[in-house]
Amino acid sequence: MPRDARVVCAGVPHHVTQRGNYRQDIFDEEEDREKYMEFFMKYREKFNVKLYAWCLMSNHVHFVVEPSTEKGLADLFKFTHMRYSMYFNRKKRASGHLFQGRFYSSPLDADHMYEALRYVELNPLRAGIISRVDAYKWSSMKMRLTGKGKYALSSVHEYVEIDDWKAYLKEKCDEEILKTLRERTRTNRPSGDVKFIKKIEKLSGQTFNF
């Protein structure tokens, strides 16, 4: 399926993902993940982007974020990945691209955001890296469940009501919505109902065919 021009809308949550070049690992050790999040949080604040969920896997990253400007999302990942690539290549005495092209993203309506939050946080469980939902350090899941962590999250309650996060993570996922989320993120198209798609078309000036 062809990849559309990226659509970014200010004030709308987006699912964002990006892989290492040729699916190579982008993190070797905990220090690397610390450094990545240091850069990410610095530029998240600079470009005024809300952070709802995140997960760092060995060769890719996932986020649910909300930019305050159309340019803010691209700037956040441009500068985060530029600074992190410089750090990682210097450490490895390597050169070349660390990340695979541009990031993929999809604006989310409330139903798709509800699924995207746990889709992002449950990545390590699906990959078989952990056996308990609270056992992975490098995602927003642990902070949600324990209230402890240095990477501050924005409240999701403007869009979704989740009172018991652990119970929410254990709910059966809506596979149809997840399928849509994956497909629309890969092709940079919005994930939502007809009303939401029309809203994004109006905001972006783009037309989407499904």
Enumerate the predicted regions with their spans.
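Glycine/serine-rich anion-binding loops at beta->alpha junctions
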Residues: 60
